[in-house]
Amino acid sequence: MAHEGYHEPIDQLSAPTRDMHRAIVSLMEELEAVDWYNQRVDACHDSGLKEILAHNRDEEKEHAAMLLEWIRRKDPKFDEELKDYLFSDKPIAHGHD
């Protein structure tokens, strides 16, 4: 799995590839944190703690959005796909018959 590290010898990977790996792994971690906080918010019975957990979850969403934007700016194909699918009213699976 990507979160376990590199799949190819690191000395054969360019600096941009290593940076992209860092960003992708970080994005995965942020999304995992959102999932964990969602579960904690659902399971929590203390309203004060629930509010803190929801706040923390939303900060993780901000981090994920920042990483996704960095990836978009660095990867032309991601840029193309995100511009096609995000913030659109088109069917999500458009273009796939």
Task: Name the predicted role of every residue range.
Residues 1-97:
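Iron-associated oxidoreductase/ferritin-like identity signal
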